[in-house]
Amino acid sequence: MKFKMFSVIVGTESCIASCPFCVSGVKPNEENLKERKINWRNLKIAGNLANRSGIDTVMLTSRGEPTLFPEQISEYLKHLREFNFPFVELQSNCIPIALNKEKYEGYLKEWYEEGLTTITISVVSNRPEVNQKIYMPNSDKYIDLTDLIKYLHSFGFSLRLTCVCCKNMMDT
């Protein structure tokens, strides 16, 4: 069997976005904002299997929003270093980062130093008003995506916009 990517689930199902298509759709609360214990032994087994399978990319993702658990992202990156994956990506809506740059600045520096190469930002459209309607319906506007991209580039990250395909959301 040939694998292409090693996916690592960070955090819980908790998310601050309000996507109508979300599989978990769980808002942050006292219970789901508690970091779960990670089985580092099993991560090592999976990392070794990924190496033997020729995988070159790790995707840190979540059932919710991974950046709600920045300490856990840091811990995963530290444990993944021993496997020398050339590409380590984080899939996120990046809303927490955009709304609180001061909180995340130290983490972003650390993540880059620990080997995070790419951040994939989830969007549903190239139009801010459509992204706002899906991700942040209770806010007046969507995050400033252009500013966020410049900010993340300033740390050295490669970026990719990952478009969640929804009917009538993206221009032709």
Please annotate each region the language model reported.
Residues 31-89, 93-172:
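Conserved glycine-rich "GG(E/T)P / GGGxP" loop and the immediately following alpha-helix
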